[in-house]
């Protein structure tokens, strides 16, 4: 649970309400602990958006942004970057397409009319006119980005000079798969950008400083830390 109030689509965490519940007495507090060992506070989505805009603006050919399909705020930042650069956006990967259709229908994902195109349409467009937002951040063998890296994707062929942005974190245990995909993309000649190169990801899991703030507000009798 990140406490930042600068997310593109979310309401800020209602800390006064949590404090009121603490006054009344909380028997059990279940709280995210994924980044509990990381000191300080997590980065904000507002810090990521300008970087994505710059990377998309400076790219000469196709841009492919890999993100978690559940991270609608990040996808909105990617869409905003594409719009600012005069590019269309296509979603790639079953979960990404489904989630963004729902997000758009509910008003959580917004773009000027005509921004979104299908993958079939994107495959026929000039590379510098489109941004693909895709699944596959963890090197899943059947995910869209992995199939692109193996040159097995039905609609898109990654070419020398394309820009691939991993706007995600590396989940422990997936290193071999992710680096394998990165290596294949690099061998093609793509410009691969990860969070180790430039700040293109902010965790949605609060750091130790944010968790301390929450626990001080809630003051529970019992706590059950959990990790997603």
Regions found by a protein language model. Give the residues of each.
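His/Asp/Glu-rich metal-coordinating catalytic cores
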Residues: 1-124, 143-154, 176-179
């Amino acid at each position: 649970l990140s406490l930042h109030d600068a997310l593109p689509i979310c309401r800020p965490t209602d800390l006064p309400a949590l404090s009121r519940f603490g006054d009344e007495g909380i028997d059990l507090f279940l709280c995210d602990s994924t980044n509990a060992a990381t000191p300080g506070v997590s980065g904000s989505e507002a810090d990521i958006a300008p970087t994505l805009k710059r990377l998309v603006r400076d790219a000469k050919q196709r841009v492919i942004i890999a993100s978690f399909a559940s991270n609608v705020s990040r996808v909105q930042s990617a869409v905003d970057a594409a719009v600012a650069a005069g590019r269309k956006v296509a979603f790639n990967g079953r979960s990404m397409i489904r989630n963004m259709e729902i997000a758009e229908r509910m008003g959580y994902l917004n773009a000027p009319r005509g921004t979104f195109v299908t993958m079939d349409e994107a495959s026929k467009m000039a590379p510098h006119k489109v941004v693909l937002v895709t699944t596959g951040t963890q090197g899943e063998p059947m995910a869209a980005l992995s199939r692109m890296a193996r040159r097995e994707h039905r609609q898109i062929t990654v070419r020398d000079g394309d820009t691939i942005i991993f706007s995600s974190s590396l989940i422990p245990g997936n290193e071999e798969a992710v680096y394998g995909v990165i290596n294949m993309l690099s061998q093609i000649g793509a410009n691969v950008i990860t969070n180790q190169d430039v700040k293109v990801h902010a965790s949605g899991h609060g750091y130790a400083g944010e968790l301390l703030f929450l626990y001080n507000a809630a003051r529970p009798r019992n706590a059950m830390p959990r990790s997603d």
